[in-house]
Amino acid sequence: MNKAQTLPRYAFIKASWHASITSRALEGFTQRIPAAQVDVFDVPGAFEMPLLARDLAASGRYAAVAAAALVVDGGIYRHEFVAQAVVDGLMRAGLETGVPVLSVSLTPHQFHETEHHMAIFSEHFVQKGREAAEAALMITKTRASLAA
């Protein structure tokens, strides 16, 4: 790569709810894409991710955007509705902007804030972060070859 070329940048959004788990996705993401190429953005919860993802994708600064959240059944509302709205919104953001928007927004069948579940989901989010980074690299490479 010559000096005229710059390395692609990636945006990573993470929800603050269950931050100790969602932050692990960023850890996995930066195992595949150097942290120096990743701008990190925090949002209150999963529901706020699609709007920011769309804005970041539309900015023209990023090759791809990834968004991480853990949507769980808190017993108050139907978490499936939130999860569906988030995934639909993230997909729409990518389709509207033409920039890949990748979801690491997971909705487990069961989640309890026990040491056992925290450990399982923490490790799972590292893997899902890696997978999101690999998808970002693959899809941007494929799309670049189509444009050539």
Q: Can you say where each PLM-predicted feature lies in the sequence?
A:
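Glycine-rich phosphate/diphosphate-binding loop of Rossmann-like nucleotide-binding domains
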Residues: N2-D42
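Short, ordered loop/turn segments at secondary-structure junctions
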Residues: S16-W17, V43, A69-V71, L106-F111
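Alpha-helical scaffold segments in soluble metabolic enzymes
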Residues: R24, G28, G89-R92, E131, ...
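Active-site rim loops that border cofactor/substrate pockets in soluble metabolic enzymes
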Residues: R32-S59
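Glycine-rich phosphate-binding loop
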Residues: L52-L90, G94
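Phosphate-binding/catalytic loops
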Residues: H109-Q127
